Amino acid sequence: MVPYRNPRHQHVASVLRSGG
């Protein structure tokens, strides 16, 4: 599984990183 490679997960990671 490569979330950092998935363009769709990138958005999710951004939200999680932002904290919400």
Swiss-Prot record:
Annotated keywords: Transcription, Transcription regulation
Function: Involved in the transcriptional regulation of pufB.
Gene: pufK
Keyword Transcription regulation: yes
Region (Disordered): 1-20
Native source species: Cereibacter sphaeroides (strain ATCC 17023 / DSM 158 / JCM 6121 / CCUG 31486 / LMG 2827 / NBRC 12203 / NCIMB 8253 / ATH 2.4.1.)
Residue ranges, compositional bias (Basic residues): 1-11
Full protein name: Transcriptional regulatory protein PufK
